[in-house]
């Protein structure tokens, strides 16, 4: 990573399904960002219903690879920007929208990505915000006024 972002970070790792006793703090690689993505240094994250369902083994966890990082409602500061990102700047304070549309199906093309046929969620389909950093699509962040 560039710009002072460390190669590794601390994260709260889900090691198996169960209760809080299956969570462990560990050192993992800081997520890379791709084109159209940003890296957010997490300042706050909620414990959502999706997090508790995933942790307990309920819900759609078939493809979950362990260890996993929960936390589907993070907020923080943008510290790295991927190619093609123009609406977000380094240092922006942002809140992250957890649902990620595919941008290809009919609802997404109509601007209704919450009805996406291939909807993914931060903290479920990709690592979430119970970590020092989280990578997310730039379209999923909203600036927090200062």
Per-region residue spans from a language model:
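N-terminal Sec signal peptide and the immediately downstream disordered periplasmic leader
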Residues: 1-3, 36
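Residue-level signal for short segments within beta-strands and strand-turn junctions
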Residues: 13-16, 56, 78, 109
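Cytochrome P450 core scaffold surrounding the K-helix E-X-X-R motif
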Residues: 49-56
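NAD(P)H dinucleotide-binding glycine-rich loop of Rossmann-like/cofactor-binding domains
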Residues: 100-146
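Short, solvent-exposed secondary-structure boundary/capping segments
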Residues: 52, 87, 116-117
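Short structural boundary motif marking the start of a folded domain
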Residues: 5-12
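Short glycine/threonine/proline-enriched tight-turn/helix- or strand-capping micro-motif at secondary-structure
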Residues: 20-29
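Glycine-rich beta-strand-centered segment in the early N-terminal region that forms part
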Residues: 29-46, 58-106, 140, 145
């Amino acid at each position: 990573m560039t710009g002072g972002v460390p190669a590794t970070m601390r994260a709260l790792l889900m090691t198996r399904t169960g209760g809080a006793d299956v969570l462990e703090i560990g050192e993992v690689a800081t997520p890379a960002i791709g084109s159209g993505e940003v890296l957010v240094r997490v300042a706050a994250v909620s414990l959502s219903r999706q997090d508790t369902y995933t942790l307990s083994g309920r819900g759609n966890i078939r493809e979950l690879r362990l260890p996993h990082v929960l936390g589907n409602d993070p907020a923080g500061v943008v510290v790295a920007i991927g190619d093609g990102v123009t609406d977000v700047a380094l240092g922006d304070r942002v809140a992250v929208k957890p649902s990620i549309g595919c941008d290809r199906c009919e609802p997404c093309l109509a601007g209704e990505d919450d009805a996406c046929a291939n909807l993914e969620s931060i903290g479920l389909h990709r690592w979430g915000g119970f970590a020092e950093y989280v990578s997310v699509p730039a379209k999923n962040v909203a600036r927090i006024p200062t």
